């Protein structure tokens, strides 16, 4: 049986980390693509030279021509400009929208049957634009946001409670930005909801609110510390979890920026919601009940994403 083919479009810090993780997990043969000739080839060669030490069998190649991604089973898109200190994800919109147009055309021509995971910021608007530019089925184009945001939330909760990260489940809904909605009510430690843990004296509402805010600021905290770029280890690990769910038909329940067609009262937008990912791509959108406060926060997040999509249409009217 032929190996799967994974195309990594963008060979920066996330792209290189994706290639290494995909190799370690033996998810398939890997093509690193970047318009900056030499970088994908160099990173591909470097990671390939680690394979005898790490003990994985995968072909790693680099390319600067879209023809190299032909027939890819999965495309993970990180191409674009990352954040720098003082920038919001939204500040990147104009530059990265043009990148999505080129990437969409490349995928449409060479990998129309791929499952496409977008990481480029501002995420919810970029994945929406990428789907339109590529013309791929909406269930086969998804944004990586909720897995990362939930992972940050889970880590901070594990540190607060001094328990294993494995015993914490957490959900973050909404856009991948300052308006994201970490849901305490649907987040648990070994099945015990966070509100119950407050009553049990494990933490306080004030402390939990601080953790929720730190989750919202998770990316900005790292940007501020690095000063020259943004997070890449955790975003790459999050996208690989999604790719693996698709390639191995795992039916994983993962929060992702998925295309909504009426769910949660949202139409023709990509917003972070719980989904089931299997061989069919996004196989199901899970609609959970939101209370009044949660619904208001979610609607505020949706409105922020809608504003970004409108800004995209102003720049590229063909998206309408």
From Swiss-Prot:
The keyword Amino-acid biosynthesis does not apply. CDD domains: LDH-like_MDH. Its EC number is 1.1.1.37. Gene3D superfamilies: Lactate dehydrogenase/glycoside hydrolase, family 4, C-terminal (3.90.110.10), NAD(P)-binding Rossmann-like Domain (3.40.50.720). GO terms for biological process: lactate metabolic process; tricarboxylic acid cycle. Substrate binds at residues 83, 89, 121, 152. The keyword NAD applies. It catalyses: (S)-malate + NAD(+) = oxaloacetate + NADH + H(+). Keywords: NAD, Oxidoreductase, Tricarboxylic acid cycle. The active site is at residue 176. One of its GO terms (molecular function) is L-lactate dehydrogenase activity. It comes from the Bacteria. Pfam families: Ldh_1_C, Ldh_1_N. NAD(+) binds at residues 10-15, 34, 96, 119-121. Belongs to the LDH/MDH superfamily. MDH type 3 family. PANTHER family: L-2-HYDROXYCARBOXYLATE DEHYDROGENASE (NAD(P)(+)), L-LACTATE DEHYDROGENASE. Catalyzes the reversible oxidation of malate to oxaloacetate. This is Malate dehydrogenase. It comes from Rhizobium meliloti (strain 1021). The lineage of its organism: Bacteria, Pseudomonadati, Pseudomonadota, Alphaproteobacteria, Hyphomicrobiales. The gene is mdh.
């Amino acid at each position: 049986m032929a190996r799967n083919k994974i195309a990594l479009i963008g060979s920066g810090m996330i792209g290189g980390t994706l290639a290494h993780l995909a190799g370690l997990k033996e998810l398939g043969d890997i093509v690193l693509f970047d318009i900056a000739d030499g970088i994908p080839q160099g990173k591909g060669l470097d990671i390939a030279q680690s394979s005898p030490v790490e003990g994985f069998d995968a072909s790693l190649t680099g390319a600067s021509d879209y023809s190299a991604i032909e027939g890819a089973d999965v495309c993970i898109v990180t191409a674009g400009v990352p954040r720098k200190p003082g920038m919001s994800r939204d500040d990147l919109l104009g530059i990265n929208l043009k990148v999505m147009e080129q990437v969409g055309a490349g995928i449409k021509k060479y990998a129309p049957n791929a499952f496409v995971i977008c990481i480029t910021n501002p995420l919810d608007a970029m994945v929406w634009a990428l789907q339109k530019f590529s013309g791929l089925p909406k269930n086969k184009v998804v944004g990586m946001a909720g897995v990362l945001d939930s992972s940050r939330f889970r880590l901070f909760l594990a540190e607060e409670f001094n328990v294993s990260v494995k015993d914490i489940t957490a959900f973050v809904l909404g856009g991948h930005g300052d308006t994201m909605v970490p849901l305490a009510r649907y987040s648990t430690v070994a099945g015990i909801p966070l509100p119950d843990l407050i009553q049990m004296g494990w933490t306080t509402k004030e402390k939990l609110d601080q953790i929720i805010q730190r989750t919202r600021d998770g990316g900005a905290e790292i940007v501020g510390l690095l000063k020259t770029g943004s997070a890449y280890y955790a975003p790459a690990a999050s996208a690989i979890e999604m790719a693996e769910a698709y390639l191995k038909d795992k039916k994983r329940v993962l929060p992702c920026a998925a295309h909504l067609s009426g769910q949660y009262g949202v139409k023709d937008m990509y917003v972070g919601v719980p989904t089931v990912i299997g061989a069919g791509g996004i196989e199901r959108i899970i609609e959970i009940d939101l209370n009044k406060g949660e619904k208001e926060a979610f609607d505020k997040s949706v409105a922020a994403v809608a504003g970004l999509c409108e800004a995209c249409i102003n720049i590229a009217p063909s998206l309408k």
